[in-house]
Amino acid sequence: MTLAKDIASHLLKIQAVYLKPEEPFTWASGIKSPIYTDNRVTLAYPETRTLIENGFVEAIKEAFPEVEVIAGTATAGIPHGAIIADKMDLPFAYIRSKPKDHGAGNQIEGRVAQGQKMVVVEDLISTGGSVLEAVAAAKREGADVLGVVAIFSYQLPKADKNFADAGVKLVTLSNYSDLIHLAQEEGYITPEGLYLLKRFKEDQENWQEG
């Protein structure tokens, strides 16, 4: 089994991912979605957590070998980023969604030198908007952001466009396509459910029609 499928299997088993194509969830944007993901749950399961963190380390070594500092997004990327930095013996920082409104007004907590080569850690990629804002903040502070790593991606076309437009490389350990096919193989969903999940990936607005 590939790492992507192994992680997908863990996410399903520990219920970090729920699939309900016949009774969809409603996202904050109002979109009806057949999938809900809470990767913070992974922190409660040592075997899953170790699989993910080791996967991150290998992915970063392969994709971003010149990395000098790991940064986690607040809050979901912080624990994973801290563990990765420890495993790689690298400095760690984290990036707030907006600057503090008191004290020094920091948006990045930790010490990042001008030109320091950074990899940003996120837990989930939907459209990529929030992590790309974090990347922009890090660049404003003088970091040389090499790219973003994440546990899981919904593989939405909007995310592909956003990362391409920003010129930011994205590496994910697992993804929507691997997960939904594995879910059908392991009996979490029916063939009809798989069909609906495939439609959602193609058209988030109209996947329930037809």
UniProtKB/Swiss-Prot annotation:
Alphabetical list of InterPro entries matching this protein: OPRT (IPR023031), Or_phspho_trans_dom (IPR004467), PRibTrfase_dom (IPR000836), PRTase-like (IPR029057)
Coiled coil stretches, renumbered: none
Protein name: Orotate phosphoribosyltransferase
Binding residues annotated for orotate, in chain numbering: S126
EC numbers for this chain: 2.4.2.10
Quaternary assembly: Homodimer.
Domain of life: Bacteria
Reaction(s) catalysed (UniProt annotation): orotidine 5'-phosphate + diphosphate = orotate + 5-phospho-alpha-D-ribose 1-diphosphate
GO terms for MF: magnesium ion binding; orotate phosphoribosyltransferase activity
Gene: pyrE
Source organism (scientific name): Streptococcus pneumoniae (strain ATCC BAA-255 / R6)
Listed PROSITE patterns: PUR_PYR_PR_TRANSFER (PS00103)
GO biological process: 'de novo' UMP biosynthetic process; pyrimidine nucleobase biosynthetic process; UMP biosynthetic process
Keywords tagged on the record: Glycosyltransferase, Magnesium, Pyrimidine biosynthesis, Transferase
Keyword Signal: no
Pathway(s) served: Pyrimidine metabolism; UMP biosynthesis via de novo pathway; UMP from orotate: step 1/2
Job of this protein: Catalyzes the transfer of a ribosyl phosphate group from 5-phosphoribose 1-diphosphate to orotate, leading to the formation of orotidine monophosphate (OMP).
Binding site for 5-phospho-alpha-D-ribose 1-diphosphate: R96, K100, H102, E122, D123, L124, I125, S126, T127, G128, G129, S130
Cofactor: Mg(2+)
